[in-house]
Amino acid sequence: MSNKIRKGFTLIELLIVVVIIGILAAIAIPKFANTKEKAYLASMKSDLRNIATTQEAYFADFQVYVTGGASNVGGATGTTLNGFVPSSGVTVSSTASGGTGWTATSTHSGTSKTCAIGVGMTPPTPATVEGEPKCTP
């Protein structure tokens, strides 16, 4: 009788490894999807903060906010707001009221959520605090 040394993995060991990889993937994939959504929302909020900065700079110079509305602010088909250019995939719409206040909303092509900000006027939904961007849940 000869003693053969068997090398390699058994079928059970391979199945256990596959199950562990499956569990790790099931945990990781939703986390990555959520990260993408957070990045879209951060981009939209950043653009709204940039509009706020642009509006405040204009107000510091002329004691009024930029008046008139604009759809797709800074976009190829929209009105430029003092050189503001939105992030890729973001569309920003702005309205103003007689130079004493303004509101802006932003959307992203990668999500159905909307973010908004306002100063000197009733903030648009979902914004609730003046000057602070907020997004729909």
Predicted regions and their residues:
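Aliphatic-rich helix starts adjacent to a transmembrane/signal segment
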Residues: 31-48
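N-terminal single-pass transmembrane signal-anchor helix
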Residues: 2-32, 36
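Hydrophobic transmembrane-helix microenvironments that flank and shape a buried ionizable site
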Residues: 10, 44, 52-53
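Compositionally biased non-globular segments, especially hydrophobic aliphatic-rich helices
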Residues: 13, 42-45, 73, 131
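Conserved short hydrophobic patches within well-ordered secondary structure
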Residues: 3, 19, 41-44, 104
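Periplasmic/extracellular, small/polar-rich flexible segments of pilin-like filament-forming proteins
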Residues: 49, 53-137
